[in-house]
Amino acid sequence: MASDVLVKCVVWDIDNTLLDGVFLESAGEPPPADPVLVAALRELSNRGLLQALASRNPPEAAEYVRNVTGADFAAVECGWGSKAEAIARIATDLDVPVDAIAFVDDDMLERAEVAADLPDVLVLSPEDAADAVDWPQFSPAVITAEARRRGRLYAERRSRQAAASVFGGSRDEFLRHVGTRITIAAATPSDLPRLQELSVRTHQLNSAGEPVTEAELSHLLASADYEVATLRLADDFGDDGLVGAVFLAGTGATSISVPLIMMSCRALGRGALDALLAWTCRAAAQAGATELTVPCLVTDRNVPMRLALGVAGLRAEPGSVAADGRALFTRSLTGEMPELPGWVAVEAGK
């Protein structure tokens, strides 16, 4: 694992790791939690890192650990199969890249298996994990209120997915059924920390394909040459807060460019990116533009962003990828505009 990759999820073993003993070998009350590792887990949770369990234990072991640690585990894999496979499932379930996962286990053989099968995972002993709170991979530059709620947000996500799995209607009908609320508004200086966090953490839904510095974001917010809008997302399951933003350049010109559009992966499948792109097209047209352009860095990870651009009517010419790896997506603003769903509220811009 590269030293500059920020860990997004820590997967913990239970026996002799989070617990000071073996769950199934206790004659009476299960063993207590390891206070040092629980302190590390809580500190990392407060920094916005997701916590998960992968253990050769029955499900009740995970419930016990949840109770004694007070942790909001975003994913739990209890069973007798390969831990490498369990970690891969966790990565898929949480939509976290494997190279952004750390795995903590007391068993040297388990660590060796995971290291061999998933070489991009950062594999740690419990002793290493206790020190990891001081490592740069575990220290986000920005810690926002959304970050501190991340574990709970993923718990809400599981409840939402469970409800969707038994709902008989379409996606849009489900979004209405659960009271989806999207608010698009002009960004303010107080949004800067969250915008910086989104810039660093978003990969699949990020047109720039690379982080933007806090200084650059601050300049864009303050500049009269740019309009910056944020998107907040909530429903009956909970409030996700600020999950997306779009930056428009050249407002008032016949061609408006979008140097950056980004969205948290938590918003995937919930209509948020479609709504933000529809608003962007309509806002650009209302400003007098006849064309909208979005330069998008072509990466393996941001395929969902490029697909969403296509759904919004933006097209890149075949073979149009420039030397810097960016393709220019364009659409005319003189025809029919994408519709905004009824659950989208738009506040006044700057």
PLM features per residue range, with description:
Residues 36-67, 76-81, 191-194, 208-210, ...:
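Substrate-recognition element of Asp-dependent hydrolases with the DxDx(T/V) motif
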Residues 5-24:
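Asp-based phosphoryl-transfer active-site loop
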Residues 236, 242-320:
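Acyl-donor binding region in acyl/amide transferases
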Residues 87-108, 114:
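Conserved Lys-Pro-Asp/Glu-containing loop-to-beta segment of HAD-superfamily phosphomonoesterases
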Residues 4, 46-50, 218-244, 304:
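A short helix-loop-beta-strand connector motif used in the catalytic cores of GNAT acetyltransferases and
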Residues 19-33, 206-207:
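Metal-dependent phosphoesterase signature
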